[in-house]
Swiss-Prot record:
InterPro entries: F-box-like_dom_sf (IPR036047), F-box_dom (IPR001810). This is Putative F-box protein At2g33705. SUPFAM superfamilies: F-box domain. Transmembrane segments: none annotated. PANTHER family: BNAA05G37150D PROTEIN-RELATED (PTHR31111), F-BOX ASSOCIATED UBIQUITINATION EFFECTOR FAMILY PROTEIN-RELATED (PTHR31111:SF132). Residues 14-59 form the F-box domain.
Amino acid sequence: MMKTRACSNPMNEGVNLEQIPYDLVLEILLKLSAKSIARFRCVSKLWDSTFRSRYFTELLFIISSSMQI
């Protein structure tokens, strides 16, 4: 059996992701490429449901269609 070792990341200490406003998270996620969105759906159930939500897909469509001028 392979042993795994927990990595201590100083960037994660003291940071509670629930404290980040959802709108800010959406703004960041909307800047991702389609390839990254497809890959990041596996991060968590919350991210998967966010990427699949009608609200997110409509925002993504509006942003992408406004950039193709």
